[in-house]
Amino acid sequence: MEQQYKTDAEIYAVLEREIIDLTIRPGSSLSENPLCARFGAPRSLIRVVLQKLQENGLVRIVPYKGTTVTRLNRRIVDELIYERTAVEGRILRDFAPIATPAQRAQIRARVDAYEALARAETQDFNKLYEMDCRLHETWFAAMDKMYLWSTLQNAHADYSRFRMLDTMTTGGLDEVIADHRNLLNAIERCDLAAFEPLVERHLYGGIRRLGSKLTEEYADFFEPETVK
């Protein structure tokens, strides 16, 4: 048994992280009894946690059958990338002309921090994911568009897991580092025409890198009817 978890929020945070970082694979079963034993929690508390996970699209509860981790919806992933490409390109075009020296320095520091994590002897994929989010959050925060950012970030069930799958399995971190450097350079040059193609290349990178693995090696991670 793990340490005693006193609240449903603490247990939820652990399971949410494990689902997002694919420690718990899409399609896996989550049974109440093993969870009660693992967390030293009563069944009533575990049921509250599972209900919240279902509300956030991370599990599906079928009465009298059990709870399973949802599979990713490929169509939703595609639409979220399409949406984020349009929104983030506009944010960067608005941000670059008014970026302060302090903001540019913060972006450089976060680009450097991501690269340091990516080149570490032992990679922590959760920290890489978090640092990537912090970098992109910089220009949303600078433009006072945090509602938009939170909306994009709340798409855990599909897009966040897709990003983690890309980060963990494709060996594409050098490409991501180069994308970040190119975005930083465009901000520093205030090259407004560069943002749309750079953002599109960066955000569609996961689909490009995963390629045929989406329909072969990782096909069981996705709802079958949504895989092209």
Task: State what each model feature region is.
Residues 1-98, 212-228:
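Short linear motifs at protein or domain termini
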Residues 26, 164-167:
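Generic structural "secondary-structure junction" signal
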Residues 101-165, 175-189, 194-205:
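Conserved amphipathic alpha-helical segments that form helical-bundle/coiled-coil interaction surfaces
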Residues 168-172:
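Solvent-exposed loop and edge beta-strand segments that line ligand/cofactor-binding
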Residues 204-214:
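Short arginine-rich
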